[in-house]
Amino acid sequence: MTIHQSPEAFGYDAFLRQHQNKEVLRFITCGSVDDGKSTLIGRLLHDTKQIFDDQVTALQRDSRKHGTQGGEVDFALLVDGLQAEREQGITIDVAYRFFSTDRRSFIVADTPGHEQYTRNMATGASTADLAVILVDARHGLTRQSRRHALLVSLLGIRRVALAINKMDLVGWSQDKFEAIVSGFQAFAAPLNFTEVRAIPLSAKNGDNVVLPGTAATWYTDVPLLRYLEEVPVKSEERAAAFRMPVQWVNRPNSDFRGFSGLIASGSVAPGDAVTVAPSGKTSTIARIFTADGDLERASEGQSVTLVLADEVDASRGAVIATSDAPLTLTDSLDVRLFWAAESDLVPGANLWAKVGTQTVNAVVKAVHRRIDPETGQAGPADKLAVNDIGDVTLTLDRQIAVDPYAENRDTGSLILIDRETTDTAALGLVQTIVASSKVAPAPTASVTASAEPARSGGLLAGLKRLFGG
């Protein structure tokens, strides 16, 4: 397995093309505090040759000052960047790292283990394709391990790598490993995971992380990195119809008018019939314009300007969809919330709701139930406290274009924003759409430029506002 290739070896242009054409897997690491999440990512970066000699020297120096591994190198320090994290030996913020092999590129989010930082963990999970849930082999499953498994399930992540870490500290006991796996499978049975791959490893020593370990002769499957290289990136659950929220109208002169944005899902080509929500106007794609020239087809994750064959009135907040799979317009939503604000959420609360580039006023009509993070079972509730997960009904001041989250993670998710502080208060997943019979209004700017919260970056940027990132 070739892990690292120098651009000098075959030319910078070829090197860049190779990496641009690779599949990208987004995954998160989560679990209880001190389960070794940051150490695992640091080991992946080190053993895939992603760090330079001067970084290794700095790591050795920092390990002596801040490390938690005695006199040995502490790979967690490659990821824990905040001073508070290094002083406490824990992860607080969400840290993103990038690395690649000859097979695939990776974006990994190291998420906090402490319960008071669980809301930070939702930031990393909101865009991930896969979750690596770490469990300390000495302690087994914890309340926070179960909570994270429930959360990644609620956020639509269907593939899980169950990394049983610190196996060296239990003598690579097969019985201990199988007991943890059995307990996790029993808890996760109702969570609708399509795959749970259990891997025994030692992030500190590197066994079964990048290369196979030799201590556990009873384990004959692949190490973690090989699994991450081979797992399907786009599962059936992520296949979705074309959706592009309009970020701005591109009109440099009277001869050109296009709608610019990031394609949230699906793909589109010239000639495709599209519908613009909320106006309901239809047209066809005339051109797909980019800074590098026109495209024959554009897909999820690409930033493009769509030129339509007809003059269609639309502005920021509109959503362009293929006509064979239009969005639903509604002013009432049943939403599953991950509540992140310190104050309780109660019926009558008035917030901003942001879906893509749409921002509207939202009132909490009712709080229906709270999800128990230990069991995953729902019970009646009339309020939600910080870090609670529950189901509510929102009433909006006008219709917006949405999908159920089960059909589209991008246009089916939202954030709620405190109107007074502009802090992000919750992550929401659209469960049920209550279609309205009233006529959809013409698209307008959501709020004034000076007042609109989380103006760019969508769901992830809005969540990161919680932490000043």
Swiss-Prot record:
Spans annotated as G1: 31-38
Reaction catalysis annotation: sulfate + ATP + H(+) = adenosine 5'-phosphosulfate + diphosphate
Binding locations of GTP: 31-38, 110-114, 165-168
Region called G3, residue ranges: 110-113
Pathway(s): Sulfur metabolism; hydrogen sulfide biosynthesis; sulfite from sulfate: step 1/3
GO molecular function annotations of the record: ATP binding; GTP binding; GTPase activity; sulfate adenylyltransferase (ATP) activity
Assembly mode: Heterodimer composed of CysD, the smaller subunit, and CysN.
NCBIfam families: CysN (TIGR02034), PRK05124.1 (NF003478)
Name listed for the protein in its UniProt record: Sulfate adenylyltransferase subunit 1
Organism of derivation: Methylorubrum extorquens (strain CM4 / NCIMB 13688)
Lineage, broadest ranks: Bacteria, Pseudomonadati, Pseudomonadota, Alphaproteobacteria, Hyphomicrobiales
